[in-house]
């Protein structure tokens, strides 16, 4: 973990209220798939940092890409950043997808929902680099909300679901996965809790890893704002920012 200043290389709105922010900094060297950064807004009245998942990184160039949706004052503040600006960053944080301890799969299904799609990109890239056959299934509310389909096709097959049916399959990600003829060796998923519950229920026998989305205040496990009950004993809790955000599906009670 490192508190540092990162430099803005570029920022672009790539979908409705969704921004691609490219940053440069030394902390990129420590990044792994599934981790996140805590960004500090520039406005003095916004005291809390905001957690943003890491979409991708290039350790040689010392750059990373963050994708975020403008939903409140903090993310609105970030959207005003432009080339050459600096931003106060804490990270990289959290335990991401540890590909070294997972038996090498032949096939992997990566399921993302909304702003849970970004961390699937770097994960898919690294799995593909290992020779894994990657399938992405991304869910959005509407076509105007969708992003990164073209980028993901470089590393695997991409399927899109939209709730309103304006693009891809109408419905949810599970409306796509239920028609797959074979189950994958491993599943990785990030998105809203309802989606993660559906993914977990749809693949009870498949090794599944979930990246949880919870509101965070400190990002380092000190404030207990982002707890999640443990499976089998809901009186015990995980701190999502410190123990996760990635967990085995059988570890957590959603």
From Swiss-Prot:
The keyword Iron applies. One of its GO terms (molecular function) is oxidoreductase activity. Keywords: 2Fe-2S, Electron transport, FAD, Flavoprotein, Iron, Iron-sulfur, Metal-binding, Pyrimidine biosynthesis, Transport. [2Fe-2S] cluster binds at residues 218, 223, 226, 241. The keyword Electron transport applies. Residues 1-99 form the FAD-binding FR-type domain. FAD binds at residues 50-53, 67-69, 74-75. Its cofactor is [2Fe-2S] cluster; FAD. InterPro entries: Cyt_c3_hydrogenase_gsu, Dihydroorotate_DH_ele_sf, Dihydroorotate_DH_Fe-S-bd, Dihydroorotate_DHASE_ETsu, FAD-bd_FR_type, FNR_nucleotide-bd, OxRdtase_FAD/NAD-bd, PyrK_electron_transfer. One of its GO terms (biological process) is 'de novo' UMP biosynthetic process. Pathway: Pyrimidine metabolism; UMP biosynthesis via de novo pathway; orotate from (S)-dihydroorotate (NAD(+) route): step 1/1. Binds 1 [2Fe-2S] cluster per subunit. Heterotetramer of 2 PyrK and 2 PyrD type B subunits. Responsible for channeling the electrons from the oxidation of dihydroorotate from the FMN redox center in the PyrD type B subunit to the ultimate electron acceptor NAD(+). Belongs to the PyrK family. This is Dihydroorotate dehydrogenase B (NAD(+)), electron transfer subunit.
